[in-house]
């Protein structure tokens, strides 16, 4: 029927036109930009983690932004332009030699967000090129189910999730908590 055709087309349009981009924002404005995007109904993500700051007389838990001056924006072409109208947003991240904004694949974003939500270990962003690690699935601990690469950084085993252009998000991971994924997957 015509109605179901329209519905299908709309569904396809919505599914295919929204992509994850990295908006570069003014220092310390990540959360303000995110709040404004929320009000506009544009999905976004600012990766934060809790850090404990210790002084001699007290300790305080603060939320630190993992990727300063960056906000992930899930937008269609029209929304993508609207975001650039913010005075606090300078531009989108673009790969060297390209003109259109870099897209972070949905699967990478899903893994990254899962890691941030569930990791009990601190997550560090490693922007230096990291040799490809063995593809593994976490089978124990809070990150069970996460697929990533097992890498060694400074002699410690870590699970790494690659993000196009941004490098890898890494967290300490005992080797016994992962199993290799065969080529069958």
Task: Please provide the spans of the model-predicted regions.
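A generic beta-sheet turn/junction motif
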Residues: 152-154, 165
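A short macromolecule-binding patch
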Residues: 160, 168-178
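Short, surface-exposed beta-strand-loop junctions and turns on beta-sheet-rich folds
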Residues: 90, 166-169
């Amino acid at each position: 029927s015509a109605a179901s055709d329209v519905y299908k087309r709309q569904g396809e349009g919505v599914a295919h036109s929204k992509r994850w981009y990295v908006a570069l924002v003014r220092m310390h404005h990540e959360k303000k930009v995110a709040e404004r995007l929320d009000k506009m109904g544009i999905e976004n993500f600012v990766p934060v983690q809790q850090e404990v700051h210790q002084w001699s007389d007290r300790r305080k838990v603060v939320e630190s932004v993992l990727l300063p001056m960056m906000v992930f924006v899930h937008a269609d072409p029209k929304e993508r332009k609207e975001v650039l109208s913010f005075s606090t947003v300078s531009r989108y991240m673009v790969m060297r030699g390209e003109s259109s904004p870099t897209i972070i694949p949905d699967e990478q974003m899903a893994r990254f967000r899962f890691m941030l939500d569930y990791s009990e270990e601190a997550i560090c962003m490693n922007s230096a090129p990291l040799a490809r690690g063995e593809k593994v699935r976490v089978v124990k601990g809070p990150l069970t189910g996460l697929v990533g690469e097992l890498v060694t950084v400074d002699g410690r085993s870590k699970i790494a999730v690659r993000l196009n252009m941004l490098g890898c998000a890494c967290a300490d991971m005992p080797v016994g908590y992962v199993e290799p994924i065969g080529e069958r997957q």
